[in-house]
């Protein structure tokens, strides 16, 4: 069968939580004992066992969504369709349920088609991700491929945080490109869907791949000037916003380690990256 998990819960208001979960099992002709066993197991999975006798109106929105999720899973379906089912849950429970759904998928071999606008959730849970834009699939592949090797500007900007620099292809040798930015500076990149010299391009670089320590940059790679706008402390990492190539929204992330160089607003630095981490994509 097919299990469904909706963003708007779709629970029967006149039934208790237990009856909501038992109903699809009863329709399938399961015995009362088996229904009760499956209902108990599904409620325990979403940490809602003590609410079995409540009605939906007596539950919070987050609790109702958890019940709806349990109902989608209660009969161990072969396929589950989910429309942002975890959107109403708090962060800790949402992360717990992500791994529970993934574990259920691995244990039972069910296929889950999962709609989400949370890119982190998609990267965490998926074997394959389909990125849609205007009803068309832009790219389909495993999470590491979509994140590390986006095929166009939309995917690069949609999956994870991303920097985009506009420029023109100065030199092109196979997939190795030299790009002249709009402010005249040169950077190295990997050509993706760019075919010829003189073509306008958007170069995509992930914030965590940007380096500012000379010893971490590849030899002979071009570096460019950056001015620090602000630095935000995020615990395990530091997030610096830079002015690069006349743009104020360039982001660099680096580890918060003992003895890490401290950057200050107004400071000028040189930044660079490995050419394979910068992807020359279709223009803006």
Over which residues does each language-model region extend?
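Asparagine-centered polar/low-complexity signal
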Residues: 8, 20, 133, 162-163, ...
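Short, conserved clusters of charged catalytic residues that mark active-site
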Residues: 96, 150, 164, 223-224
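Short beta-strand-centered aromatic/proline hotspots
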Residues: 167
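ABC ATPase nucleotide-binding domains
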Residues: 1-3, 7-157
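Non-catalytic connector elements of ABC transporters
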Residues: 162, 171-284
């Amino acid at each position: 069968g097919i299990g469904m998990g909706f963003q708007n819960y779709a629970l029967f208001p006149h039934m208790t939580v237990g009856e909501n979960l038992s109903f699809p099992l009863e329709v399938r002709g399961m015995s009362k004992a088996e229904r009760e066993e499956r209902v108990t197991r599904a409620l325990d999975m979403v940490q809602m066992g003590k609410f079995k006798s409540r009605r939906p109106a007596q539950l919070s929105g987050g609790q109702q969504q958890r019940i709806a999720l349990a109902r989608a899973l209660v009969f161990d379906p072969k396929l589950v369709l989910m429309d942002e089912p975890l959107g109403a849950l708090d962060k800790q429970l949402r992360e717990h349920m992500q791994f529970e759904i993934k574990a259920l998928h691995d244990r039972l071999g069910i296929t889950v088609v999962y709609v989400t606008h949370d890119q982190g959730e998609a990267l965490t849970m998926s074997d394959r991700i389909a990125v849609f834009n205007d009803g068309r699939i832009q790219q389909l592949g495993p999470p590491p491929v979509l994140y590390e090797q986006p095929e166009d500007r939309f995917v690069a900007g949609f999956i994870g945080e991303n920097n985009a620099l506009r420029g023109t292809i100065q030199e092109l040798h196979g997939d190795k490109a030299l790009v002249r930015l709009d402010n005249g500076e040169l950077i190295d990149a990997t050509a993706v869907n760019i075919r010829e010299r003189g073509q306008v391009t958007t170069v995509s670089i992930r914030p965590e791949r940007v380096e500012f320590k000379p010893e971490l940059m590849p030899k002979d790679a071009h570096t460019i000037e950056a001015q620090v706008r602000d630095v935000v402390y995020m615990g395990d990492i530091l997030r610096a916003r830079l002015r690069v190539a006349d743009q104020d929204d360039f982001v660099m992330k680096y580890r918060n380690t003992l003895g890490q160089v401290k950057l200050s607003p107004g400071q000028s630095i040189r930044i660079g990256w490995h050419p394979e981490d910068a992807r020359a994509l279709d223009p803006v």
